[in-house]
Amino acid sequence: MEQRLIGREAELKLLNEYINSNRSEFIAVYGRRRVGKTFLIRKAVEDHFAFFMTGMNGVAKGEQLVNFSISLQKYTHSTTLQTFKSWLLAFYALSQYIETLPEGKKVIFIDELPWMDTAKSGFIPALENFWNSWAVLRNDIKLIVCGSATSWMINNLIRNRGGLHNRLTHHLIVKPFTLHECEEYFKAYHFGYSRKQIAECYMVMGGIPYYLSMMDKSKSLAQNIDQLFFADNAELKDEFNDLYRALFKKSADHIAVVTALATKGMGMTRQELVKASGGKDNGAFSTVLEELEQCGFIRLYEPFSTANKMTSDIRQKRNTLFQLVDFYTLFYFRFIKHNKYQDSSFWSSSQNSQLYHTWAGLSFEMLCLNHIDKIKHALGISGVQTLVCSWRSSNTEKRTQIDLLIDRKDETINICEMKFYKSEFEISKEYEEKLLEKLRIFTEETKTSKSLLLTLITSFGLKQNKHSDIVQKQITMDELFI
């Protein structure tokens, strides 16, 4: 079955504009591994490349150059393989070949570019020379480079301070699917999943197209999850190590950080994280955190305080929290890494267990955080400046916390409660009292003078009863799919 391009309308429109411009373009496309970058580019160009190659992971300069030579030979149709001792000569040969082509746009696509930049290879200076001394002087070259190592792409191309400084004409990030795009995908491939099941799928693996492509429409969601993660021959059983090793050269440091963060849902301060991960509080540790953030595995946020400033640099604050937000990584640590059950049908048999319900509640909170723009739209505050954060009582005996609050510039705070249920959520007398106490403690400790709006986000809405009036605003899961 032919693969279809789902969503990506904005990204496709931009790529087409760049490709059809009247000047040479240097375009960097980046994003998390398995997110569909290469597929998007191939669809945009319709595989009409003047030259296309993919870098090799974990090999030295010599083999990378041989790989380049083989790719070039496919386009030149030469009967002999031309070999190169340096990247400077390799790119010169590419320019010589391109000059033999007829008039018209010439798309050069180099995939997994970061893998080609091996130690002391001279790759970046050669790429700089290729662009600065040849490609930019023409008006028909469309150089598209792509990579999953997001931190490399940002630091070596987008923020380059050498020969490529300000030479990149465009950069485009390809993000995971939203819930809406996941729904489009499942409809296009004739899956009969409900929105609740699509949300649960997202809570397991995020909106990663590659993972979705491995699912079988003839199986239930639970069966698919078992097949991908828990079966004896599960295709994604080793995905965790493969993922981090492909993205980071010293992946052990990054794995140590996410391992520590997986133990604390709300996140850790830098000092807590240094201690928990066994790292050292230095520049190298800052680099690891920055790379994880750039790749979308963690986020930085500031716990709620009346002293919060919406324009200040969060990285300079001691109370900044680092939180693990990658769905697959969270699922891995909770269920896969220490799967003591050794049950190939583990997920199917866990659907009504307390283990499942606890996970679903926490993961739904992360799903809401991931779709905060949809929540703001549903609240009618898309244009209002906000801080999205959490709060925990300083009184350890009370143990009161709010996992999601939206601190608004219009002197209002949405206190969000998130509930993932199979039917309408019903507020009991006990839960109403708990909510009132939470609001009282929050107001008392924070001394906030802002208005508080209790906001309930549920899978199927709120059941009306004599306790439901405590909620000022409710949002259903459907509004996250818009």
Name each model feature, range by range:
Residues 1-350, 454:
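Phosphate-binding site recognition
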Residues 314, 318-482:
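A cross-kingdom feature that marks ATP-driven nucleic-acid transaction machinery
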